[in-house]
Amino acid sequence: MSELAAALTAAMRTGGSDLVVFDRESAAWRRHRWPEVHGLAEGIAAWLLDRDRPAALGLVGEPTLEFVAAIVGAWLAGAGVSILPGPVRGAEGRRWADTTLTRFAGIGVRTVLSHGSHLDALQALDPSRPDEMVVEDLAVAANTGRRCPEPPAPHANPAILQGTAGSTGTPKTAALSPDAVLANLRGLNARLGVTPADVGCSWLPLYHDMGLSFLLASALGGMSLWLAPTSAFTASPFRWLAWLSESRATITAAPNFAYNLVGKYARRVSGVDLGALRVAINGGEPVDCAGFERFTTAMAPFGFDAGAATPSYGLAEATCAVSVPAPGTGLRFADVSDETGTRRHAVLGAPIPGTEIRISPRHDAPDGIGEIEIRGASMMDGYLGHAPIDHQNWFPTGDLGFFSDDGLVVCGRAKELITLAGRNIFPTEIETVAAQVPGVREGAVVALGTGENSARPGLIIAAEFAGRDRAGARAEVIQRVASVCGVVPSDVIFMAPGSLPRTSSGKLRRLDVRRSLEAVD
């Protein structure tokens, strides 16, 4: 048994806390003791060992008691885990199922567990599914009533096969060892000061590194976790606040867009008490300082402590968390100035224990800014199908940033940097300004440089638009960007809501946007 499996076993068997799962059909919370979850995990492990212990178990579906148990059960059996998302709204079921099983087969997964409509769609592919692919009912595998036999000998399988974002390129699969996963969970819990008295609340998808880490850190820390499916949040985002209030959650996490949404429409909020929250992690995408500050201010009348605001930095290649401020720090800013003015960036704290960060100078980055490089115990062994990495070497993240007196500051992606008239501009600065125009959808704007190696480089802004006056909005976007950012867009292209391509975790696929625009030209 790996140290990761042993640590989770010790925490789950002895803990007095609960896993509380939201059931969408009844709109009710179902409470389960962690020892009960571990008992089902043992059943999953026995089921897998009966089948010669596959190298990795594939999981698909919304979070249930059995789904959570299957993650731990795979590790009890010495197997790895890969979790893939269900179909997005409007997807054709058979095509989604075929793509999902093909993705699993491509990373060596031959055993898949699922439930509900996801299971039906995956099993309907038989006999056209990939060779030797087995798709079974998750509930049947979990409820065998059996205990895991004597722990198998340790082996070299990764604990997690985690897809990377792929927002600026082709997605890859990070192979994470049990030791790396455990180091990251311990480092995160140490930074946050997690105790069994804490209560977590999350609707983050478990196929995303932040959602999976939140779940595992809760189990390892012995705290209760209220876990809702992402679809329940999407259907009614303000439920999140009601869940936080009902659970008396002390820790939660969400991507930036969720905080922006709640802050923007705070007038809809009533009857909630957020006074128990001591940590509200903002991660998974760039932090909009104004939007996060608006959230903290708007939620103050409901008991939210501004010190709970926790903007953080992480990536799948490091399991998840890289830098996180200490609880109580709150939202702090660092200014970046040039000839066009000063822009604020969120300070994302210090490296978690076991992780190191350095800034490597780059000739194409603005003065004082370099590429963020990391190393430490949480690092992946490498990308699946690629050469392994040396954990003693520094890993280039592709992100640009610097250290302020208060911690790490991330300015943007190196690949996304736009060069115009001798200036280097981060697209997030332009996108934030453009999103302030009425009708432009927040979090649905992409700024791209064009012809940067030609005599006439330009700037194109593509945005989802839900207003009526396109011409007026287009003119206002150009005027605002020119005034605030000091560059004049060559073109502003409005698109229908939901049409910009995104990754499975909701990040905009900038490379795909660029390709689409180039194809139109």
Swiss-Prot record:
SUPFAM superfamilies reported in the protein's UniProt record: Acetyl-CoA synthetase-like
A GO biological process held by the record: fatty acid biosynthetic process
InterPro entries, sorted: AMP-bd_C_sf, AMP-binding_CS, AMP-dep_synth/lig_dom, ANL_N_sf
Domain of life: Bacteria
Record pathway: Siderophore biosynthesis; mycobactin biosynthesis
EC number, as in UniProt: 6.2.1.20, 6.2.1.47
Location of region: Disordered: 146-172
The keyword 4Fe-4S belongs to this UniProt entry's keyword annotation: no
Gene3D superfamilies given in the database record: 3.30.300.30, N-terminal domain of ligase-like (3.40.50.12780)
GO cellular component, one term: plasma membrane
Pfam families, sorted: AMP-binding
Catalysed conversion reaction: a long-chain fatty acid + holo-[ACP] + ATP = a long-chain fatty acyl-[ACP] + AMP + diphosphate; a medium-chain fatty acid + holo-[ACP] + ATP = a medium-chain fatty acyl-[ACP] + AMP + diphosphate
One MF term in the entry's GO annotations: ATP binding
The entry's keywords: ATP-binding, Ligase, Nucleotide-binding
Root EC class: ligase
Keyword ATP-binding: yes
Role noted for this protein: Activates lipidic moieties required for mycobactin biosynthesis. Converts medium- to long-chain aliphatic fatty acids into acyl adenylate, which is further transferred on to the phosphopantetheine arm of the carrier protein MbtL.
Record-stated family: Belongs to the ATP-dependent AMP-binding enzyme family.
Protein name: Medium/long-chain-fatty-acid--[acyl-carrier-protein] ligase MbtM
Origin species: Mycolicibacterium paratuberculosis (strain ATCC BAA-968 / K-10) (Mycobacterium paratuberculosis)
